Each structure stands twice: as C-alpha cells, then as structure tokens.
C-alpha cells in the first residue's frame, strides 16, 4: 500500500510537470486535459483521479511552488524589535527566490503571461486574490507594528506605505516575468528596495546595525 501511495504521488507530480510544460507552450486556455495527459504519459482518467478539472490542476500547480515558500517568506515579517527591517528582509527574500529558482519563475510566468482569467478560469483568479489578501494582511500588520513602534516617517501612513511597497513589488515581479531580468537588474532592484523602505523610516529611528547586515547578507 505504501508503494501504491508513493506511485500515486509520483503520478500526480508528473501530471503537474506536464501541465506546466503545456501551459507554458500553448497557454492555459488552449491546453486540454488530453494534451496534458499525453505529455505526462498517463490517461485522462489518471488526471481526473487527482484533479477534478483544469482549474484545480492550475491551482495545484501554483500551490506547489507558493506553498513551500509562503511560510518561509512570511516569517521575515516577524521582527518585533524592528518591523521595518522585517519588511525589507521579506522583500529581499522574494527577489532571492526569483533569482535562485527557475522553476518558481516558470510557474509565475504562466500565471502572469499565459492565462486569461475569464470563463472557466475565473475561479483561479479568485484563488489568487485570496493569496494576495494573505500577503497584504502580513504587510499591513508589519507596517502597523512599525507605526506603533514610532518607526514610520510622518510623510507615510500605514495604508500609503503598504500600498506603495505592494505596487513596487507587483510591478517589479510582473516585468521580471515578462522580460527576464538579469543579475545586474536584480541588484538594482535590491538597492531600490532599500531606498524605498529607508524612506518609510523616521529619521530619529535608525535601523539596528545587525538588522542592516542581515538584510545585505540575503544576497551575499
């Protein structure tokens, strides 16, 4: 039985791999379960054993990469002594994931450039909105902690700071997935993030030296 479960999981992973290949090649809307089954070397019935439909398969493809990173990345926010440093480390860690992991870039490239979120894929957009909302809550909580600690500069509110950082990150990742940034551009983005997050900080509330060193160590 143990081997059967192992084989079942192996088949599931093979189907997900095949779905990524097909989605990237011809787009999500044109991809049929028959085409994915052929790519995976399985029957259409084998796909239905693991996934109810293409939408569920698409969601599982995203969750396979997002799920393994979400907790690690979100933990960067948990910096009680310096919430703004936690925000910076979170943003830098997101960049590192895109620099280091081609598979992560591939999946999110499908999400951004290979799918129309209408008709049968409307539910997938709602699922992505849920992921976004979870991230937004973490970010807002971190900025609220920064404000409560007296870290937030007077020109910024919790809402304006969180919205600005979110727009920076979303635009950065969208362009990265469309145009394949290189290491030099990634370093420019790191510098931009440090400047942006630095502007959030009140002048009389400097980052702790060890916190700055930790942020820089993320890309050393």
Label each residue range with its predicted role.
Residues 96-141, 151:
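Short secondary-structure transition hinges
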Residues 1-10, 204-220:
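N-terminal intrinsically disordered/low-complexity leader segments
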Residues 60, 74-106, 158-165, 205-206, ...:
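Hydrophobic alpha-helical connector segments
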Residues 110, 156-175, 187-196, 219:
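Hydrophobic alpha-helical segments that form the core
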């Amino acid at each position: 039985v143990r081997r059967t479960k192992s084989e079942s999981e192996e088949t599931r992973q093979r189907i997900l791999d095949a779905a990524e290949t097909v989605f990237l090649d011809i787009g999500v809307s044109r991809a049929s379960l028959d085409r994915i089954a052929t790519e995976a070397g399985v029957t259409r019935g084998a796909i239905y054993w693991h996934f109810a439909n293409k939408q569920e398969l698409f969601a599982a493809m995203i969750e396979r990469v997002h799920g393994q990173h979400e907790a690690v990345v979100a933990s960067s926010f948990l910096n009680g002594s310096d919430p703004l440093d936690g925000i910076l480390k979170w943003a830098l860690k997101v960049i590192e994931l895109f620099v280091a992991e081609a598979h992560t870039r591939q999946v999110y490239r499908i999400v951004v450039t290979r799918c129309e979120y209408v008709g049968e894929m409307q539910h997938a957009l709602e699922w992505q909105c849920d992921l976004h909302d979870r991230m937004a809550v973490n970010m807002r909580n971190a900025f609220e902690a920064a404000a409560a600690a007296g870290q937030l500069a007077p020109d910024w509110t919790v809402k304006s700071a969180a919205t600005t950082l979110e727009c920076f990150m979303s635009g950065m990742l969208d362009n990265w997935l469309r145009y394949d940034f290189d290491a030099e551009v990634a370093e420019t983005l790191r510098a931009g993030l440090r400047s942006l997050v630095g502007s959030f900080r009140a002048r009389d509330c400097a980052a702790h030296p060890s916190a700055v060193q930790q942020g820089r160590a993320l890309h050393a």
